[in-house]
Amino acid sequence: MRSMFDQQLKTLNEEMLYMGGLCEDTIQQTIEALMSGDVKKAHALNNMMSQLTQQERSIENICLKLLMQ
């Protein structure tokens, strides 16, 4: 059981790192869209924000599973 818990913690860590990368990309793209005034690029950020929201939910689910054990 302990090894399963450790594996879930490892998965949580990997998901958090992935989300951190998504945040970095989103911030960079936002800055570029603002600096260039590129409306298309700004609209494309909605997709990135959706990915972040989905990743957040995934992380929340992992955390809930860990807490319920």
Regions found by a protein language model. Name each.
Residues 1-69:
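Cytosolic, long alpha-helical scaffolding segments
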